[in-house]
Amino acid sequence: MKKYVISLFMLMFAISVNAQNKEQVIEPLPHMVENLELRDLRNKPTHMPYWGDKNMLIFYVDPDKHRQNHDFIMDLEENKLAAGPNIEGFGIINLKDTVFPNSIVRALARKRTEKNKAIIITDTDCNVAKEWGLGDCNNMFVLMIVTKEGELVYCKKGEFSKTDQEEFLRIVNKYR
């Protein structure tokens, strides 16, 4: 009986490690991605806006780290450094990795979007990270560029250095 329990435990551990590794797979850029069904701020099913019509600047944010890169993002918005006729930006809140209740995060996001008219949708199960091969996005602010053809051409996670900011501006200019 003891051997059976130990074998069962080892099997469960191996399955758990394998499942975690699948979520951690990072695909090299560029690669094609799909428009996923996510949730709006009222928790209704929705898809990503602008898909197939415009290049997309996507802010994929863990609410626990929403202030990461704050100064850089404010500079982008205020000075329209990533704006252009061929690109639109929107946010996706990574609800799976936050300690905050989803309803509170959605309510705060609704309040903010009423003021700034930004488009924000939510990802309740880290589907964007898993399906797009982003790897672990917990506690990270992720900035991505997806072409209107559905190709993920830029992805940077975490805190941006000055060099990262310059690289992003150089790349985003191609898609504006």
Which ranges hold each PLM region?
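Positively charged n-region of N-terminal signal peptides that target proteins for export
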Residues: M1-Y4, A19-Q20
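Thiol-/selenol-based redox modules, centered on thioredoxin-like
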Residues: N139-R176
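Short active-site neighborhood of thiol/selenol oxidoreductases, capturing the structured segment around
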Residues: H47-F72
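Structural microenvironment flanking redox-active thiols in thiol-disulfide oxidoreductases
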Residues: H66-T113, A129
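N-terminal "domain-start" segment that seeds a small globular fold
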Residues: Q20-H47, R67
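Structural micro-motif
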Residues: V33-E34, K115-I119, L134-M144
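Sec-dependent N-terminal signal peptides
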Residues: Y4-F13
